[in-house]
Amino acid sequence: MKKILFFYIPFIFLISVFLSFGILKLKIQGDIFKALPSQDPYVKLFDRIGEEFKGNMIGMVILEGKPDIFNEKTFKKIAELTEEYKKIKGVSSCLSLTDIMDIRKIEEGIEITKLVPANYIPKNKREFDSLRSYIMSKKRFKGVIVSENGKYASIIIRFSQNEDREKVAKEIKRLTEIKKGDFKVYYSGLPFTILSGSETIRKEILKLTPFAFLILFLILFLSFGDFKAVFLIFIPPALSLLWILGIMGFLNVPLSIVSNILPVVIPVVGSAYGIHLLNSYFKYGKNIKEAFNQIWIPIFMSGITTFAGFLSLIFTQLDVIKKFGIFTSIGVLFCLFFTLTFLPILLSFFKIKKIKEEIDFPPVPFMRKISEIVIKDKFLTISISLLIFLISLIFIFKIKREVNMISYFSKKDPVRITTELVMKEFGGSMPSYILFEVEDFKDPTVLKMMKYIEDEIEKYPYLKHSQSISDFIGEMNELLTGFNSIPDSKEKVENLYFLIDGKPEIEMVVSKDYKKALIQMVSGIGETKIDREISLKIEEILNKISKKYITIDVDSLPVEFREKIINDYVDFYTKIIKNSINSNDTSKIKNVLLSFFRDNLYENKKKEIAFKELDKYFGSEEAIFKIKDEKKKKIIINEIINSSNIENVLHKYFRNLKNEDVEILKEEIEEIIYEAKRKGFVEEFSKDFQDKEKLKNYLYEFTGKKIIIPYKEDLNFGKILEMNIYYSGIPIIYRRIDDNLLKSQIQSLLMVIILVFIFVTIEWRSIIGGIFSMIPILFTIIFYFGILGFFHIPLDAANVLIAPIIIGIGIDYTIHVLSKIKKEIKFLEYEEAFKKMFLETGKAVIVNALSVAFGFLVLIFGNFIPIKRFGILIFITMIISSISALFLLPKFLFLIKPKFIKK
C-alpha cells in the first residue's frame, strides 16, 4: 500500500497542479446563440450577412432627456458619445441624431446632408421646436433614433462581424460610464445582453460553488457526525471539479449559460459515491477491504449509469448542451475513479471515529415510519402513485418552451427593464434580415418587389422600422414627384443612387456591386412564442412572393398579347394593393386599374394637371424654348394638350427650332403629359379608398411605362428577372434553438433510457430486472414533466438537462436498493428483506438524495431564472426519485415477486 501511495499521491498532486493552470485560462460565454453549431444554415446565413453588410448585430445606447432630449446639452452629449464610439475597434458604424443621413428637397432638386451636423447644434428653443417637428415627420427618424415622446434618444451601434462583440460591448459600456455625466443611460441589444449574461455567470460561479460545498458539508456532517469523514467524501468531487475545469480551460471550452452549473453538478453528484463507500465502511467495522468488496459494484454501476445519463446529451443538436454533457460525464468518471481508488487508500490511513449504530439523521426516523406503513398496505402506495402518474401525463401536453435570452433575466434586472423600455419607445433591438440576391439592384422591378415585401412586413405588429434601399430611393423620388414610389427607368434609379452612394446607411443595406441588398427590421418582445410567430410570418410572406418576373415596355406590347398581359398586370397589382391597404373589395380595385388602360374618365383632371405642369415648364429656364408672353403660352399649351399630333403644333409655333430640338421638346412634353395622366388617375381614383397615401403611391407606380408580371413560360419577350430571397435574424435563430431544444430533450431522454436499461439489464442478468429498475425513474420523469405543465414552467436550455440527470442520478438509488434486496431476499422474507434494506441502505439513499437535492437547491440564489427553476426542479425530483426507489419499487417487487430478485 505504501508503495502505491508513494507513486499514486504525487501523480494525482502533479496532475492537479498542472490542470489548475488551465482554470486560469477558463473563459465565460453568455451567448445563447452559440447553442447552435456554426454550420447551421440559418447561422451561416446570419454570419454571411454580417460579413457583407458591416455586421449583423446592433446595440443601442439610450439617453434619457430632462424633460426631453431636444436641448443643446443632450445633443452635445450625443455628438460626443457618437464620435467616441466610432473610434472603438469592432464598431463598424454609429447612427444618432448628430450622425445620420438626411434627404431634403431644395430648389435645385435634392440635397443629401446630415440631420444635425455635430458642429451645428441648435441654440434656442425655437430652433429645437422646428427641428423636433421635422424629425417627427420623418419615418426614418421617429421611433428609431428618437422616441415619439421625445424623451429618449438612441445611438445605434453596429458591431463588426469578426470582432469579439462582448469585448466591444464592454468597452462601449466602460466608455459611456466615464463620459455620460449626469445623464441616465440604458444599454440594449444582444451584445449587451450577452455581456450581462457572462458577467452574471461569473458572479454565480463564484457565489454558488462555495455555497453548494457548504450545504453538502452540513448535510454530510449531520449524517456522519465527523469532520474527517466529510472531508474525505469531498476529496473525489473536489479533485474531479479541478481536473475538468482545468481541461476545459486548456481546450478553450468556455463555461456557457448552460454549463455554468457544472461547478455545482460535479460536487453534488460526485459526493454520492463517497457517501455509499463511507456507509459501507462503517457498516463493516471500518474493514476497508470488506467494505470495498461489498459496495464497489453498486457504486461502479451507479457511476456508469450517471455517466451515461450525462453522455446522452451529446446526441442533442445544441452545442452548449452537448459540451455540458461531454465534460460533466467526464467529471463523473473522474469522481468514480477517485472514489474507487483514492478514497479507499485515504481511509486506510485516516482514523475516523465510529458513528452511532442507531440511524439518527433527522429525516430517517420519519422515513422509517412511512416505510412501516408502506409494508402493511396492499394497494394504497401503488394507487396513489398511479393517480399521480396519470395526472402528470395529462399536464405533459401543456408544456411550453422558452429560449429567448431576455426571458432568462428577472423582471427587476436592468437587462429586462431596458428591453421593455426599448420595445415601448423604439420597437426593439433584435434584428431580422431579408437578403435579396439579383443581377442588378438598380433594376426598378427588384426595388418595387422589395418595397411590396416591406409593406407586407410593416403590417405585422411585432416587426418595426423596416428599412431597405427601396426606402431611400422611394424617399428621394417622393421629393421629386410627390409619390413615394420607385422610378420606372433604370436611368432614373441610377441618378438617385449617385446621390447616396458610399453613405454608411446605404452600405448597410446594399452591397458595393449592387447584387445583394437587405430589408432590415427589429423586434423586441422577449418570448420564444413571439420569436417563432415572427419568423413563421416572414417565411409565409416570402413563400407567397414569386421569385421570377417579366418586365415589358407598355409601348412595345405585341397586339395579340396586349389584353392578356394587361389583365395579368392588373391582377398582379390588384393583389398587391389589396394586401397593402387591407381592402377586401377586389373587383373595385381591379376595375379602377383597368380603367387606366381602357377609358378616359379622368381626362379633364389630366388636362388640368398637364396645363399647370406645361405652364411651369415653358416659364422655366430648363425649357428648350422659354415662352415669355403669357397669353401666347396659354394658347400653345391648350393646343398641345388637345392635339393628337404634338409635333405639328411645335413646328407651327417654334419654326426657328432645329428638327432635333423639336424632337427633344416633343419627348419632354409627352413625358409631362404622361405624368399628368398618371397624377390625374391617382387623384381621381384614390379618394374612394382608405389609406389614401399608400394607395396613391401604388397607383402612381402602377401607371408607369413598364409592366411587371410573374414569369410565364408562354411569353417569349420582355426582360426576365430572377431573385433569390433568404431570411435570417435573431427570431429565426431563436426558433431554431427552440426546435432543437425539443429534439434534444426527446433524443437525450430516449438515449439515456436505452443505455441505462441495457446497463441494469446486464447488471441483473434479466430483462425483467431491467424493467423493474426503470419503474422509479420513469415515474419521476413523468412527474417532472407534469410539474412543468401544471405550473406553466417552460422547457428551456437549463431544465432540458433535468430528465437525463433524473435518470443518471436516480438510477443510483434503484441500484443500491435492488442490490440490497437481492442480497437479503436469499435469507429473508420480502417484508424482512425490505426492512433490512431500509435500515442499512435507506440511510445512504436518503443522505445521498438530500445532499443532491439541497446541493442543487443553492441554484435558487442565482440570477438567471432558468437556473433558479433548475435548482427547485432538481430538488423536487431527487426527493421523488429516492422515495420511488425506497417505497414504490419494493412495493411492486412485494406484490409481483419476480423471479430475477432471487437469482
PLM features per residue range, with description:
Residues 1-30, 34-35, 41, 48, ...:
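Membrane-embedded transmembrane helical bundles of large multi-pass transporters/channels
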Residues 23-69, 75, 122-145, 158, ...:
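Solvent-exposed, non-transmembrane loop/terminal regulatory segments of multi-pass membrane proteins
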Residues 39, 44, 87-158, 164-167, ...:
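Extracytoplasmic
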Residues 58, 89-101, 132, 142-144, ...:
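Short beta-strand elements
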Residues 58-62, 95, 145, 154-158, ...:
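Soluble periplasmic/extracytoplasmic beta-strand elements of cell-envelope proteins
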Residues 76-85, 167-176, 449-457, 533-542:
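Short amphipathic alpha-helices in soluble, non-transmembrane regions
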